[in-house]
């Protein structure tokens, strides 16, 4: 399957008029694998709290989960910028480009927190 024919990993279908563009199937598989690993880490955290393990150890594991989520987030953002945003800005209407700029600003503000 060509990259252009794939669907984007973003939630483009949740907004009327938005079209998903592309995601590399290998990136999608990699992100899903990472998310499953994170899910396992979170289950481990639940067990640690349930078993009243030492707070510092729990906090170290929480930090590990947060970094893993940031890694997935960066990969999704990269894909969104390279495909969805690039297409909306270069080939979309002025309104679509403006909406994409607003969306990107919102995403940057959210990730900067």
What are the language-model segments listed below?
Residues 1-113:
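Solvent-exposed interaction patches of small proteins and small membrane subunits
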């Amino acid at each position: 399957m060509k990259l252009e024919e794939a669907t984007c990993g973003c939630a483009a279908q949740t907004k009327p008029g938005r079209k998903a563009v592309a995601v590399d199937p290998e990136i999608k598989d990699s992100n899903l694998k990472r998310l499953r690993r994170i899910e396992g880490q979170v289950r481990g955290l639940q067990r640690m709290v349930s078993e009243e393990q030492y707070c510092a150890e729990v906090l170290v594991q929480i930090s590990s989960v947060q970094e893993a989520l940031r890694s997935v987030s960066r990969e999704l953002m990269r894909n969104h910028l390279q495909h969805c945003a690039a297409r909306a800005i270069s080939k979309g209407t002025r309104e679509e480009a403006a909406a994409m700029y607003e969306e990107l600003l919102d995403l940057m503000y959210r990730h900067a927190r």
